[in-house]
Amino acid sequence: VTTIQVADETFVAAAPTTAGAVVNDRARWKRWFGDLRLEVVEDRGDQGVRWRVSGPLEGTMEIWCEAVLDGFVLHYYLHAEPTRPLPSEPAAAMAEVAELNKQRRVAGKEMSFEVKALLEGDREIGGPATPDPACADPASADPGSVRG
């Protein structure tokens, strides 16, 4: 069993095609996961990124952006082992593991809420997903076309 296991998901009401620009921005990685060294194992563009993690933890981490409805679910996974030894006393070791997991869950949630805030912008709660500005304005589409 992996010592550090984090799995989280957040729905982002924004076009899935907007995800890659944010989650693949290396400057943001430093802010989100500053103490970890990240080596890209798989860059999936708008669908996310997979890393090999080193530093205070060794393992794998992933952001997967799954298109759902008119937005996407941002999945965050971290599976890792601490590189420094845990305390030898069982209760202290369990407390340390709990704290390490909490720190990484909080960091993941802060990351996902930042992605959500950036991409949803001033979207009205309950309103349609924020469109991709690079795509044509749906209002300018041919009025005779039928959407299915």
Residue ranges, per PLM feature:
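Generic structural detector for well-ordered beta-strands
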Residues: E9-A13, R52, W64
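Short, exposed beta-strand/loop patches in secreted or surface proteins that constitute
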Residues: R37-D43, C65-E66
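Short, hydrophobic/aromatic-rich segments at coil-to-beta transitions
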Residues: E42-R52
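Hydrophobic ligand-binding cavity/cleft-lining segments
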Residues: V1-E39, D137-D142, V146-G148
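Hydrophobic pocket/interface hotspot
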Residues: T18-V23, W29, V49-W51, L74-Y76, ...
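Residues that act as N-cap/strand-start positions at coil-to-secondary-structure junctions
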Residues: I4, G34, G45, L57-G59
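A generic structural signal for beta-strand entry/edge sites
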Residues: T3, D46-G48, L69-V73
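Beta-strand/loop substructures that line and gate deep hydrophobic ligand-binding cavities in soluble
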Residues: S54-P131, G148
